[in-house]
Amino acid sequence: MKVFATDLDGTLVHNKKVTETDREAIAAFQKENLFGVCTGRPLSCLFDVEGIPFDFYIMCTGALLLDKDRHVIEEHLLDKELVRYIYNHYRDYSNIIVQTESESHFYFTDFIDFPTFTMIKDFEEIKDSKFYLNTHKPQVSEN
């Protein structure tokens, strides 16, 4: 048996969709092997891979591990005060995504357009108590 995990954006997902060829290859691979997803996205942002029965999920840049039924195997949460500190001190240097335990949405700074994201201006707007954190460096043009 082999185990294979894929990223989504720019790897499996192109132009917000998965090709039929990739879907067929995944189904064939899964007949004797395990196929999972490994992404920075939270669980609520898998809308463009609907219909792919992943055998495991590595979400939130490794902070959340789920089995095929989406039961938590392991999670690494951050304290709200630590997330607040990081957000307040580093938001000018990096695009910071603050992901919460809420599956319906999560909060972020201002650089990604996803239907399940809610933009915040102040960290105090976040009412959830469990946090994951992601950072993305702004892309720099090489002109």
Q: Could you tell me what each predicted segment is?
A:
Residues E101-N143:
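Conserved acidic, metal-coordinating active-site core of Asp-based
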Residues E20-F117:
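Active-site phosphate-binding/coordination module
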